[in-house]
Regions:
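Alpha-helix termini
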Residues: 19, 33-36, 58, 74
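Aliphatic-rich helix starts adjacent to a transmembrane/signal segment
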Residues: 29-46
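Conserved catalytic core of two-component sensor histidine kinases
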Residues: 16, 43, 50
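Periplasmic/extracellular, small/polar-rich flexible segments of pilin-like filament-forming proteins
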Residues: 51-137
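N-terminal single-pass transmembrane signal-anchor helix
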Residues: 1-34
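Compositionally biased non-globular segments, especially hydrophobic aliphatic-rich helices
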Residues: 11, 40-43, 129-132
Length: 137
């Protein structure tokens, strides 16, 4: 008898089948990882916006209705994460504000937050039910 070294075709096929089964189990668990990461970024931006708005209110006794990356009178100095689009809606007074934020990588839509029970703007995020708590669908 000769002493052969290596794997038989059957052994290789069994390994391929086992790897295929493991991949079929693992892929659905990781399929929406990117969407979860984008959602976390959206919620983080809304939480940071709420903190920045409260700081702006402490300085000027009104909430900001616009934002930018440079210092400007009456404008909140704030920037959002890459590819996020933020819209602040609210009166420039002490009654409150609302904001929605979206990202093309987040299929369910936009996230929102509002502050103030007498909010006079027209864009109060419908998904937000608790004041100051950012919500995503």
């Amino acid at each position: 008898m000769t002493n052969r070294k290596g794997f038989t075709l059957i052994e290789l096929l069994i390994v391929v089948v086992v790897i295929g089964i493991l991949a079929a189990i693992a892929l659905p668990k990781f399929a929406n990882t990117k969407e979860k990461a984008v959602k976390s970024g959206l919620l983080s931006d809304l939480k940071n916006l709420a903190a920045a708005q409260e700081g702006f209110y402490a300085d000027s006794s009104v909430y900001a209705t616009t934002y930018g990356t440079t210092i400007s009178t009456g404008q909140l100095q704030f920037s959002v994460s890459q590819r996020n689009t933020l819209v602040i809606d609210g009166a420039s007074d002490a009654s409150g504000w609302a904001a929605t934020i979206s990202n093309p990588g987040y299929a369910p839509g936009s996230c929102g937050i509002f502050v103030g029970s007498t909010f006079s703007g027209s864009g109060t995020p419908a998904a937000s039910t608790q004041e100051g708590i950012p919500v995503c669908p």
